[in-house]
Design a protein with these regions (language model features):
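Long, basic N-terminal domains or extensions that often function
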Residues: 1-165
Length: 165
């Protein structure tokens, strides 16, 4: 299922040149991070006024797709002794989070190696966004930044509210 995501950063009066810079940075960063997080989405649009920075993401998927990857391990000669998994195979299986009996042998240009198929379930979009939104705000760069309150947060002007729908 897809939905439109909206992030609004409400601030005190921002300098005009910072609004333009921040919107460009937000558009690039949001697009890149959603792609890296394997979240399908449509167009990323940005809007700004002197007191608001807004990002809108059309058709954002509600969760990541599951990721299935094949991981290459040690050569078969090191991993198995007489068909029984040795320390190398057991350690590789443990590192991949699979049972040693699930390991497969495949031929590679460097000889037969052990492979593990690892399935990583996709996370919910909401969980991913909880980590991404603060990163997007912290990554914004500009000429003059200030701190306010007791936190370490830096921004062009004090942030008064965040809206994420």
């Amino acid at each position: 299922m897809t939905a439109t995501f909206l992030l609004e950063i409400g601030t005190e009066e921002l300098p005009a040149d910072f609004v333009r810079q921040a919107l460009d940075q937000l558009q690039q960063r949001v697009s890149r991070d959603l792609r890296e997080a394997r979240l399908g989405h449509g167009a990323v649009s940005v809007f700004g006024t002197p007191r608001r920075l807004v990002v809108s993401v059309a058709d954002l998927e509600d969760r990541q797709p599951d990721l299935q990857e094949d991981r290459k391990g040690p050569p078969v000669a090191q991993a198995f002794k007489d068909g029984i998994p040795g320390p190398a195979a057991i350690g590789f299986a443990k590192r991949c989070g699979v049972d040693p009996s699930a390991l497969e042998q495949r031929d590679t240009p460097k000889g037969p190696c052990v492979f593990a198929t690892v399935l990583t379930p996709g996370q919910a979009c909401v969980e991913l966004l909880q980590g991404l939104i603060p990163q997007w705000i912290d990554a914004l760069q500009g000429r003059r930044f200030m701190r306010w309150g007791t936190g370490a947060q830096r921004f062009s002007r004090p942030i008064r509210w965040l809206l994420a729908l």
